[in-house]
Amino acid sequence: MMDLELPPPGLPSQQDMDLIDILWRQDIDLGVSREVFDFSQRRKEYELEKQKKLEKERQEQLQKEQEKAFFAQLQLDEETGEFLPIQPAQHIQSETSGSANYSQVAHIPKSDALYFDDCMQLLAQTFPFVDDNEVSSATFQSLVPDIPGHIESPVFIATNQAQSPETSVAQVAPVDLDGMQQDIEQVWEELLSIPELQCLNIENDKLVETTMVPSPEAKLTEVDNYHFYSSIPSMEKEVGNCSPHFLNAFEDSFSSILSTEDPNQLTVNSLNSDATVNTDFGDEFYSAFIAEPSISNSMPSPATLSHSLSELLNGPIDVSDLSLCKAFNQNHPESTAEFNDSDSGISLNTSPSVASPEHSVESSSYGDTLLGLSDSEVEELDSAPGSVKQNGPKTPVHSSGDMVQPLSPSQGQSTHVHDAQCENTPEKELPVSPGHRKTPFTKDKHSSRLEAHLTRDELRAKALHIPFPVEKIINLPVVDFNEMMSKEQFNEAQLALIRDIRRRGKNKVAAQNCRKRKLENIVELEQDLDHLKDEKEKLLKEKGENDKSLHLLKKQLSTLYLEVFSMLRDEDGKPYSPSEYSLQQTRDGNVFLVPKSKKPDVKKN
């Protein structure tokens, strides 16, 4: 045989290519081009696709490396969960000032940031627990004077004001203490350069300045030269939009409280009593007692003002005093709008709100009874006699036994006029909702309430002026219905509506009858099922009794069998063995002693 050279299995032969060329010329609509059958062309496309895939993988790898390098420069914030750039350790530069209260600290550059262990070691080296470096108690007592007992709260010294010559001379410290202070500043610089403490964002200007206190030999009268720490500079941004008149009144009243001739007037009772006052009324009392100096030109004495302030903060709060506050002022419409429907027991000499019921318990119980009803049922209850409550006058409820008097004659007159208007309101007028100022228009309410109970067929029959009721159209027999229809003349629309009403009514009645029959059948089946269950229980009970009696009979029979078998004897007078013999009874009633057949023993090979 001749060996034929076969082309590789993956490559088409020349004969196949010629056949494909012939077929393509005969039918161009093969759906594919000739390049598809060209293996070299397909191989080039495969190599090109492979190169694109490798290039794509290379780009993805490069992007992953860039992301890895980018995230290496970030740190995760544990509080917010976002990535933040790692900030290098920045050294805090201290500001230099000409004042004696500020110390000059030179900037110490650091090549590497200190960590916590290095910092602790540096602290141990700087402040060793040795008696040589400790300051003696006498030196400490000479530097730190005793604070007078009448000054309970710490008083800060204003650093932006010039000090007296005696104070500046008294603040001169020994040389060794200056060196220790510089060491402390240097340690603070190194502490704040730790990366773990960068999140604190502590600056030198926010740190508490350490100032020297004059020795006890200085006169106690120098307290008058000090200026108490005022909260006005910190409030300049908040009260910047206020008028100068208000700021002047604030400064006068605040300075009159603090700038006293005798420091003993700053008692603990007056300083700490503001802790017992509710913070909700802080701004109200604040505006109340600072407005007095602006009204009168004469300033009260410091002792009287301190005594009145302590009484105001420690004494019981009167309801009439609260009416001065803006939250209880009747002249503010925004505050009165919030308490239109208030159920509070405190009466502030204001008229009852028209929008709310006279008693909240009555309104809540009335609303609960109407909660599960439909709109039509609610309207029926509204229209029923006795359902509308009579708005009689009621005595207002107060928290105290005395009546609260109005603050001014004009204000009291306005409230009395408003009460008179509320009493003269007609009783038949419906209560309005909180968003309305007038009573709703109720002219057509009765007719709409009646139409709400009509069905769709009744409304259509009423619109076409059909003189017969819908129930009569549906329920009349055929003869009576035809006789009724012959007595009247109807147009096509009326006839079509009457037929439609009767047809749908009959269908409805038929459906109701069908459902009724189905329900009756279901009830009958339930009764049959209950009867079968009772019969089953009865049969099971009888079966149990029969089984019990049968078991008793078997027991009696076995007892009789053993008794008869024990009475039998052989020729020798010996009893028969029950394992070898048995008693059997024939149909005629005779009993025979039959030996039991023994099975022959089969030996297994």
UniProtKB/Swiss-Prot annotation:
Comp. bias intervals (Polar residues): 334-354, 579-588
Activity control note: Activated by cell derived metabolites including itaconate and fumarate. (Microbial infection) Transcription factor activity on antioxidant target genes is significantly inhibited by SARS coronavirus-2/SARS-COV-2.
Keywords: Acetylation, Activator, Cytoplasm, Disease variant, DNA-binding, Glycation, Glycoprotein, Host-virus interaction, Nucleus, Phosphoprotein, Transcription, Transcription regulation, Ubl conjugation
Localization, UniProt: Cytoplasm, Cytosol; Nucleus
Record-linked InterPro entries: bZIP, bZIP_Maf, bZIP_sf, NFE2-like, TF_DNA-bd_sf
Motif ETGE motif, residue range(s) on this chain: 79-82
Known glycosylation sites: 462, 472, 487, 499, 569, 574
Residues bearing the modification N6-acetyllysine: 596, 599
Domain comment (free text): The ETGE motif, and to a lower extent the DLG motif, mediate interaction with KEAP1.
Family as reported in the entry's similarity comment: Belongs to the bZIP family. CNC subfamily.
Protein name per UniProt: Nuclear factor erythroid 2-related factor 2
Source organism: Homo sapiens (Human)
